[in-house]
């Protein structure tokens, strides 16, 4: 993955993610995330009772965005991604709690979105500059 994408995803903390609901329709949710830069995963906390986690029975495939909140056109940056969501393993949980240490007291379930394909748009690199990435070892 391009180092500029890694730097951006490490800097940010809020993702908008879309799952598929029981009627086959898109269902969007937002979540704080930690980025696993070794395995290229977004790690987030969510309850088994949440709608989006329940919808994983329909499809583990998700899509989403991470975007810088700015009104300055020259600073616009963001990622559009597709991935596969599953329960996080122990090392991924450690990464999440290293970033959001205060969440550990609530002992939330941590989920991992394995990034499979993404497009990074950055006006910082040049107006409308896009960098695409795709995982070579597809799930």
Report residues per predicted region.
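Extreme N-terminal tail/first-helix region
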Residues: 1-16, 138-139
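Helix-adjacent hinge/juxtasegments
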Residues: 52-79, 83
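Charged, gly/pro-rich active-site loop segments
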Residues: 73-139
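A generic structural signal for nonpolar/aromatic side chains embedded in well-ordered alpha-helices
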Residues: 9, 55-56, 96
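Short, catalytically relevant binding-site loops at active-site mouths
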Residues: 34, 49-51, 70-72, 117
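Short acidic (Asp/Glu) patches
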Residues: 46-49, 63-68, 91-102
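Short beta-strand segments
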Residues: 12-48, 56, 63-67
């Amino acid at each position: 993955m391009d180092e500029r994408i890694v730097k951006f995803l490490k800097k940010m903390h809020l993702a908008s993610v879309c799952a598929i609901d029981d009627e086959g329709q898109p269902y969007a949710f937002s979540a704080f995330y930690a980025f696993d830069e070794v395995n290229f995963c977004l790690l987030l906390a969510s309850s088994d009772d949440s709608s989006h986690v329940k919808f994983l029975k329909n499809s583990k495939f998700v899509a989403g965005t991470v975007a810088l909140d700015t009104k300055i056109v020259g600073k616009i940056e963001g990622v559009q991604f597709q991935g596969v969501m599953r329960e996080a393993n122990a090392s991924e949980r450690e990464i999440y709690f290293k970033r959001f240490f205060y969440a550990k007291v609530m002992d939330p379930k941590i989920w991992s979105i394995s990034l499979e394909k993404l497009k990074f748009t950055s006006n910082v690199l040049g107006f409308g500059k896009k960098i695409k990435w795709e995982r070579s070892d597809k799930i």
